[in-house]
């Protein structure tokens, strides 16, 4: 399913769709950041 992410509450199906939500839940601006993933959200 999709989850809200980011300050604007955008919905996304993949981490990379939404400023790369990392495992910590912090959004990063690029997939090149350590810990970011393009895995699907559960």
Swiss-Prot record:
SS bond partners: 5-19, 12-22, 18-27, 21-36
Cell compartment(s), UniProt: Secreted
Domain of life according to the entry: Eukaryota
Alphabetized UniProt keyword annotations: Disulfide bond, Ion channel impairing toxin, Neurotoxin, Secreted, Toxin, Voltage-gated sodium channel impairing toxin
Tissue: Expressed by the venom duct.
Any one of the GO CC terms: extracellular region
GO terms for MF: sodium channel regulator activity; toxin activity
Pfam families the record matches: Toxin_19
Predominant location category: secreted
InterPro entries xrefs: Conotoxin-I_CS, Toxin_19
Stated family: Belongs to the conotoxin I1 superfamily.
Free-text note on domains in this protein's UniProt record: The cysteine framework is XI (C-C-CC-CC-C-C).
Role according to the record: Iota-conotoxins bind to voltage-gated sodium channels (Nav) and act as agonists by shifting the voltage-dependence of activation to more hyperpolarized levels. Produces general excitatory symptoms.
Protein name: Iota-conotoxin-like R11.15
């Amino acid at each position: 399913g999709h989850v809200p992410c980011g300050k604007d509450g955008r919905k996304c199906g993949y981490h990379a769709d939404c400023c790369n939500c990392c495992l910590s839940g912090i959004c990063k601006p690029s997939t090149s950041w350590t810990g970011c993933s393009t895995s699907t959200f559960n």
